[in-house]
Amino acid sequence: MHLRDSTKDTLASSGNRDDDEIDDGQHAQFLDADTVDSEESIEAEPVEENEEWSDQGSGAEGSDEGGGYAQYIDPDDDIDENDEEGMEVSGNDEEENSDHEEVRILVLLNSGYITAWYILAQCTDAEIESVPYDKLLKARRIMRRQSARGHATDEEDDNEHESIEAKRDLAKKKLREMYLSSHSSSSKPKLPPTSSSSSFLASRERKNAPAVMSSRRPVSRLRQVVKPIQNAKARDPRFDSLSAGPVNLDLHAKSYGFLPDLYQTEIKQLRDQHAKLKRTEIHHAGPRAKSQQAAEIRDQRAHVEQELRRAESRQNERTRRERERSVKADFKKENQRRVDAGLKPFFPKKAQFQEALLRKQFDEMAQGSGTGSSASLRKAMDRKRRKDAQKEKKSLDAALGGGSRTDIRPMRHFSDAPRPHKRGRRG
């Protein structure tokens, strides 16, 4: 009786609402007072235009109780429950007219959606009391389930997302296991890439195998479309192998025979300039002179002296090379004469060649004109004598245990006498 009374009060209170609120699609709320312990508010969902309804012919037209009604087909209901309800509603043909109100209320409550609450509000107390108690309990259970389903929508979305991720991970795991099982014949199977392509490319089947690298290289933004033109290098055709072939020294000496005179003239001018600057430095730029003019004179004299030494060095090098060519030419002529005479050619050693060069040098000094040639020869001989004497002295000191050589120990070290200890050193 408590359930019927609460249902009656709820329908009566909901009937006072305006039709405008019904059109706006607001949900009707019902208070379920079945139990004494707790009270629950049940939300009813509005009717959608595209929902499926089936007209019931019995009592729809020509009935004394009022207009027709529509039945909502709920796909969530079980087949057994629908069959049982159909059997209870249509099982008794004799009480069909009397239980018309009961069937109408039962269908609306059984669907779980109280969409025609304004029709139920017009029912009398007798019509509400005629509904069986178990059907009211069933309607309350269905409405609770619908309400719980609406509140759990967000949780279901989260659970659905997590389930999708779990299924995806499970599929990846199965694919990997299938790949490993298919390549189980090899000793060290090559695993497919899991995290990144770089780690997969860096992996190798064997430690001695070459590293695998990607052939895709990024194109540089600074591309050199047109190559720069190389600067033309100047070349002298007189000494170029493309035009003149190998250099003929004899032909070159004959063609440029005037160059030695120019070299001698240049050296003479540098010597005169150096002597003049040296006299000027003595008179105007002494060692104590600190003026700017004195510094300029010193710098100019040092520069001319450096140029003179460089010119003399180049001239001495040219003279030495000319002397070597002359000595080689003499040996070549001698070998040609020996071959013509039927003798074997003579190939001098390095020491013999150096001796011939030294003899040639002294002959040139002796053949000079005037007293200067004899003086230069005498100076050269004295310089050679001093050099040889210094060599003999070093070799004699080394033999006696002195000198700068350390590979030969002194004679006194070979004596049997013990060496004296240093001061303060214990024996």
Swiss-Prot record:
One of its GO terms (cellular component) is 90S preribosome. Component of the 90S pre-ribosome involved in the maturation of rRNAs. Required for early cleavages of the pre-RNAs in the 40S ribosomal subunit maturation pathway. Residues 1-100, 146-165, 178-219, 280-343, 364-427 are annotated as: Disordered. Associates with 90S and pre-40S pre-ribosomal particles. Residues 261-326 form a coiled coil. The gene is RRP36. This is rRNA biogenesis protein RRP36. Keywords: Coiled coil, Nucleus, Ribonucleoprotein, Ribosome biogenesis, rRNA processing. It is found in: Nucleus, Nucleolus. The keyword Ribonucleoprotein applies. It comes from Malassezia globosa (strain ATCC MYA-4612 / CBS 7966). Residues 34-54, 74-99 have a biased composition (Acidic residues). It holds the Pfam family RRP36. Belongs to the RRP36 family. GO terms for biological process: maturation of SSU-rRNA from tricistronic rRNA transcript (SSU-rRNA, 5.8S rRNA, LSU-rRNA). PANTHER family: RIBOSOMAL RNA PROCESSING PROTEIN 36 HOMOLOG. Residues 296-341, 406-419 have a biased composition (Basic and acidic residues). InterPro entries: RRP36 (IPR009292). Its main location: nucleus.
